[in-house]
Amino acid sequence: MSLIPSLSLLLMSMVAASYSETVTCEDAQKTCPAVIACSSPGINGFPGKDGRDGTKGEKGEPGQGLRGLQGPPGKLGPPGNPGPSGSPGPKGQKGDPGNSPDCDSSLAVSERKALQTEMARIKKWLTFSLGKQVGNKFFLTNGEMMTFEKVKALCVKFQASVATPRNAAENRAIQNLIKEEAFMGITDEKTEGQFVDLTGNRLTYTNWNEGEPNNAGSDEDCVLLLRNGRWNDVPCSSSHLAVCEFPI
């Protein structure tokens, strides 16, 4: 029975000693040197909850992002309107004289003479076989019979005019050329009885047949050269030989 009280007293003594040692140690941390050792630190606890948001700070300066890579070139846009003409530039310096070919060289002269000789031969052949030449006129026929309007058109096509004798020599040349009665470039279509050439000029030479012009049938406004070389008025709608004159 005496053992139990003894143990109780022992435990109470140990608790009291431990408390006393703790207080003494805490006080010793304030007054004792650092060599006095206290109890070891405890284990870190769990993190606490997030605190409340603080007040909004001042606006910061604009930031600068990193410069990206250069992209590929874009498509060409539509062409713009033409700009205004610029002012004339300064006058250039005078150039060196050029070299002109010698137009009067012996070669050019010889070629020109050869061409003139050949043209003269051709005219002689044409005169001998197809036409007649008097002075600076060449009379030519194609041997076809047609109305006066068609004769005019034919001659104009070849840059000629309907044969119109201005004197006895030309009248005779046409007479010797034809084998049929031929139209001449003479009419009184504008004014009855007043015969003129196709340019409207009055005639200075005539060779009318006896009793002509008589305007038989009231529609004889054109003139024929007969086989005997005389003239006779006939209707322009009749068909006769075409003779043209070419200036040479």
Swiss-Prot record:
Location of this chain's protein in the cell: Secreted
A single Gene Ontology CC term: collagen trimer
Disordered: annotated segments: 43-110
Bias-annotated ranges (Basic and acidic residues): 49-61
Collagen-like domain span: 42-99
Residues in C-type lectin domain copies: 134-245
Biased composition (Pro residues): 75-87
Cysteines engaged in disulfide bonds, as pairs: 155-244, 222-236
Protein name: Mannose-binding protein C
Lineage, highest ranks first: Eukaryota, Metazoa, Chordata, Craniata, Vertebrata
Gene this chain is encoded by: MBL2
